[in-house]
A protein has these predicted regions:
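Conserved redox-active cysteine motifs that mediate thiol-disulfide chemistry
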Residues: 32-57
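Active-site acidic short loop of glycosyltransferases
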Residues: 32-34, 64, 90, 111
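N-proximal helix/coil linker or "cap" segments that precede and/or mark the start of modular domains
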Residues: 1-24, 29-31, 60, 79, ...
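Structural microenvironment flanking redox-active thiols in thiol-disulfide oxidoreductases
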Residues: 50-88, 100-107
Length: 146
C-alpha cells in the first residue's frame, strides 16, 4: 500500500539509473525536467514486441514536440536487447537494466508485469500505468500534458 501511495499522480517519480547502448549509465536526473513517456519492455515479451510499430508511429506523431520517449529493457540478456534495438531500428532513448541485479527497479515502480508505460512530467507522476502506444487514449494523455 505504501508503494501505491508513492506512485499516485502528482507524486515524485522514483529515480533510476540504467545503461545506454554503449554501457554508459544514464540517470533519471538528466531527464527529469521533461515530459517522459516511459516504456518498460523486454525482447522475450510478445505483447511488448507487438507494441513496437505503434510506438514508432507515436514517436513519429510527436516528432519536434516536447515529449521524450524512453524505453527501458529488463532483458536478462543484454546482447539480445542490443540486437533488437538494431534490428527494429528503435529510436528514442534506449536503456537497459538487469532486473536480477536491480530489484529496486521492480520495487520502486511496483512492476508486476510488462509492458508497462508511464507518463512523467517535470519529475512528477502523471500516470504510472499509462495507455499503450496502440491505445488511442495515449495521445489524449500526452496532449493534455504538453
Amino acid at each position: 500500500i505504501a508503494v501505491l501511495e508513492r506512485l499516485k499522480p502528482g507524486k515524485d517519480f522514483p529515480p533510476f539509473t540504467a545503461e545506454d547502448l554503449n554501457g554508459k549509465p544514464v540517470s533519471y536526473e538528466s531527464l527529469k525536467d521533461k515530459l517522459l513517456y516511459i516504456d518498460v519492455w523486454a525482447t522475450w515479451c510478445k505483447p511488448c514486441i507487438k507494441e513496437i510499430p505503434s510506438m514508432k508511429a507515436l514517436q513519429e506523431a510527436y516528432k519536434g514536440k516536447p515529449v521524450t520517449f524512453v524505453s527501458i529493457s529488463v532483458d536478462q540478456d543484454k546482447e539480445a536487447w542490443k540486437a533488437a534495438v538494431q534490428r527494429e531500428k528503435l529510436s528514442g532513448i534506449q536503456l537497459y537494466t538487469n532486473l536480477s541485479m536491480n530489484r529496486d527497479f521492480i520495487d520502486n515502480y511496483d512492476l508486476s508485469g510488462i509492458p508497462r508505460f508511464m507518463l512523467v512530467k517535470n519529475g512528477k507522476i502523471i500516470s504510472i500505468s499509462a495507455p499503450r502506444p496502440s491505445d488511442a487514449k495515449v495521445k489524449e494523455l500526452i496532449n493534455a500534458n504538453l
